[in-house]
Amino acid sequence: MKRSKHDPLEIPSYQLVDAARYLHVPYQTLHSWTTGASPSKAVIKIASLKPPTLSFMDLVECWVLAGLRHRERISMPKVRSAVDTLRLKYNSRHPLAEKEFETDGIDLFIREAMVLVNVSRSAQFVIRDVVEAHLRRIERDDTGLACRLFPFTTSAQSKSKVDAPKIIVIDPLISFGRPVLRGTAICTSVLASRHRGGDSIPSLAREYGRKQIEIKQAIEWERAAA
């Protein structure tokens, strides 16, 4: 689906260093995915190259890609080929963010990316499970467009991610797309900064009218992203 460059979902909003933090992906990895050795070799076609800046839709695609490459070191050329196949199939600039990817797209990606790669069938099931967990953190509007992303909080790292609580949200229409506590415009970076400055979790919870566990998770998430 083609959208206007002025669409909030398509506006360049996240520089690489910030996007890497939000996705908990190494900077060099994200750089490889989005710019590569040259723009033509990039897996994700980002909104702006000078400087490299991602739109919300780009961010969502990188989130899905992080799930796809979570367990198996699939070569980048094969990943790029698989994404290009999906791009043609869906006639979309952002195939990994499309609603259709949640149905037949995952299996197609795995088939395309793993041709001639020695990955067991059981490993493919694991990859599918990880990707589905990532996809469930994407909220869509009535038309199927990705509109919010709920990154995994620290508590979700050691538990099943499928039903992990959605405490932090990235919404392009709230706080300029910066991570906030769900249901608020309270930036997680502000909470982390104030905590570093000496404010306790209980005092922050009282001031903002939120549960202590939410404040704690936001601070720990920011710490892990640093």
Model-derived features with residue positions:
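Basic, low-complexity segments
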Residues: 130-176
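Charged mid-protein connector segments
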Residues: 74-142
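Polyanion-binding surface elements
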Residues: 5-30
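Short helix-start
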Residues: 41-66
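A short, basic/aromatic helix-end/turn motif that makes direct DNA contacts
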Residues: 21-25, 36, 206-211
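Long, charge-rich, low-complexity alpha-helical segments
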Residues: 184-226
